[in-house]
Regions:
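Glycine/tyrosine- and acidic-biased, solvent-exposed loop/turn segments at the edges of beta-strands
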Residues: 1-194
Length: 194
């Protein structure tokens, strides 16, 4: 079976013999014949769950489609089978909470999205050992508010105020005993000299 694709009104449609294709599709790796992709089309559009596999047969990712657009749970995996990324999609855009993991299984990032943009909430990044690395409030897609950065042992090492994802105000660095070791002033992301 040889499907052809065609963009119509911004959506990717798949046709077989110039007709919108409805049915299951299985794509294999040419070299081995092992399964690469399994999914379903409805009237030329991707529909429902689609599975993608590594050459060794392990699941690479699972995507959900609604009339040709990513919509619903999205998951991707490392070759070792551990979860790499999970989140919601809506209208082909990230929507709701998203989590990204290190290959060892510890969380790397978490963030809240609304239709593809960082939404209001807290953006968090973690060290590979699982300890919190950085947290920043977000507003309307921008880092906005007091951001804090920690070392792998959990000690606060830096904090600064962000406005529109740019440093604005003092950035303060600390040693492990919590004593201030430097202070730098920023205005709209530009360091101000004393």
């Amino acid at each position: 079976m040889s499907l052809k694709s065609r963009k119509i009104s911004g959506k990717e449609y798949y046709l077989l013999n110039n007709e919108f294709y409805t049915g299951k599709v299985e794509i294999t790796y040419e070299e081995t014949g092992d399964l690469k992709t399994v999914g379903y089309f409805y009237e030329g559009l991707k529909m429902g769950e689609w599975y993608y596999f590594y050459e060794d047969g392990a699941t690479e990712r699972i995507e959900n489609y609604l009339y040709g657009e990513l919509s619903g749970i999205y998951m991707s995996f490392y070759k070792n089978g551990k979860l790499k990324e999970i989140g919601q999609m809506k209208n082909d855009k990230m929507d709701d909470m998203w989590y990204i993991y290190y290959e060892n299984g510890n969380k790397q990032y978490e963030n809240f999205y609304y239709l593809g943009k960082q939404s209001n909430g807290i953006w968090r990044e973690y060290h590979e050992n699982g300890s919190l690395k950085m947290e920043c409030p977000t507003m309307s897609g921008y880092l906005y508010g007091e951001c804090k950065e920690y070392d792998e042992k959990g000690y606060l090492i830096r904090k600064c105020f962000m406005r529109d994802s740019r440093k604005n105000g003092y950035e303060i660095e600390y040693n492990r005993s919590g004593k201030e070791i430097s202070r730098t002033n920023y205005v709209s992301g530009v360091e101000m000299k004393d």
